[in-house]
Amino acid sequence: MPKDTDKELTSDTSAIWKNHVSVPDTPKGFTVRTTYPSNPDGADVMLERWEAGTEEPPHSHPGDDMTIVVEGRMSIQFYTKSTDGLVPDGQQIYLNKGDTGYIKAGRIHDAKYIEDCKLVYVHDKAFGFTAEI
């Protein structure tokens, strides 16, 4: 007879969070599982894992994006460009388990992973990354 716990899934036990791979030229502590794009007007979806202490430098993306925090805690700082370089734009934003964050296309931001994070990341159309240092 199956136990009730045999029917339960969490982000620790679900196959959804397996088969992640490292990607060259990305921060240490980052792994991802991606989908296969089949629609040029579709969305790029990634299941991301970030180790606590990992940071992404200021960057932007060509499309709007949405991040859903499945597990963990992270922060985002927005920036604007000035003649002196990048200047923080507003206060740092924190996203916790269960939170959803949206970032407009082209908006410069960083990301810091305060705790181990599992994220569902959705990018409008094909994903792109532009370093803004």
Question: What is each model feature region?
Answer:
Residues 55-57, 72-78, 100, 127:
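Short beta-strand segments in beta-sandwich/barrel cores
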Residues 97, 102-130:
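Ligand-binding loop in jelly-roll beta-barrel domains
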Residues 47, 70-71, 115:
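A cytosolic small-molecule/anion-sensing beta-strand core signal
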